[in-house]
Amino acid sequence: MSILKIHAREIFDSRGNPTVEVDLYTSKGLFRAAVPSGASTGIYEALELRDNDKTRFMGKGVSKAVAHVNKTIAPALISKNISVVEQEKIDRLMLEMDGSENKSKFGANAILGVSLAVCKAGAAEKGVPLYRHIADLAGNPEVILPVPAFNVINGGSHAGNKLAMQEFMILPVGAESFKEAMRIGAEVYHNLKNVIKEKYGKDATNVGDEGGFAPNILENKEALELLKNAINKAGYSDKIVIGMDVAASEFYRDGKYDLDFKSPDDPSRYITPDQLADLYKSFVKNYPVVSIEDPFDQDDWAAWKKFTASVGIQVVGDDLTVTNPKRIAKAVDDKACNCLLLKVNQIGSVTESLQACKLAQSNGWGVMVSHRSGETEDTFIADLVVGLCTGQIKTGAPCRSERLAKYNQILRIEEELGSKARFAGRNFRNPRIN
């Protein structure tokens, strides 16, 4: 069934910044999608179009992107009469109309809003759940429920503390189901709150952009100690592993790294890529750290390559790969990492996100689906991770409704699948069904 009407508007994300929401109508009803936005963005990401009108929302308005949808994209898609099940055809048409390499004409936020809404409408047209429609688009006969990676301690550009590394995550890989993983995550989160309160006082339990705690600590090792303590107190040391998102591009300075980048600049304290790699190796040795994202700057290819070859853990590319097939192909050739972080708004369409995922998986990589720090109540990525069978998702702590919206949707999907539900568990890095 073809599109009857498309209407975009400005709404607000979880940080109080404007973002794009798209309503798409077919004869089956209304399908709504909202676009997320990142704080620590890779320089190679598709362009998120902001108005840059300083008199309005500090320049962060998205009225131009909204106008591109309402005045240009909507009339074109409606006149073409393409069925909403033809995701690739619709996405390709928008990409051709935009014509730029990085979606700078319309904005990735305009194109993605429509693309997500089309995908939801396509599922309804086929009379199947969204995750099943996505699985069909990706050519997956089965679906898999992911291990959640809960970001429970926040640092970096997501928090006002001195901690350089951006996310410290717990992954309940020993759970038997997604429901149990949620329970484990929530219980550890509450234990962590008490551990932090006892050590640093009540105001240290204020939460960051993604619902994790942001105690004012400087040493990254201290964050790992807090996690270890909370995991032990909750009684889950045999069921939980730790993941980190370092977001090292945020503190890369002239070929070196500044682990105290939120203090006044002092080049004498910068460390080399090799010294930073040794620090990571000490984390892996002393804590159950099994996944490190963006350990080095997005252009420090040599450091990535050397590190990935020297460790047996999951090394995740985010700023390095930005969900972009060209960057992923280079990272595959260079053996720079072994897992893709999949963020739909980095590339800007459902079709290209699916392509990026399949490219990574076909090269033996893991794939972790991810939210952004500026989120909405939209739950598309919950269905996406199940349909793509990636086995792992990070969408914040078990705190703040824009984070729980995704986790709760996966709970509903697990319930709906009943006895057919399969949880990735300890196989989260490569959960393919044979």
Curated annotation (Swiss-Prot):
Keyword tags: Cytoplasm, Glycolysis, Lyase, Magnesium, Metal-binding
Enzyme Commission code: 4.2.1.11
Domain of life: Eukaryota
Reactions listed under catalytic activity: (2R)-2-phosphoglycerate = phosphoenolpyruvate + H2O
Cofactor detail note: Binds two Mg(2+) per subunit. Required for catalysis and for stabilizing the dimer.
Signal peptide span: none
Entry binding sites for substrate: H158, E167, E293, D318, S370, H371, R372, S373, K394
Residues noted as binding Mg(2+) 2 in the record, renumbered to the chain: D245, E293, D318
Cofactor (UniProt): Mg(2+)
Compartmental location: Cytoplasm
Pfam families in the cross-refs: Enolase_C (PF00113), Enolase_N (PF03952)
UniProt keyword Cytoplasm, yes or no: yes
Gene3D superfamilies from the UniProt entry: Enolase-like C-terminal domain, Enolase-like, N-terminal domain
Recorded GO MF terms: magnesium ion binding; phosphopyruvate hydratase activity
GO biological process, one term: glycolytic process
Binding residue positions for Mg(2+) 1: S40
Classification via PROSITE patterns: ENOLASE (PS00164)
Oligomeric and partner information: Homodimer.
UniProt protein name: Alpha-enolase
Organism: Alligator mississippiensis (American alligator)
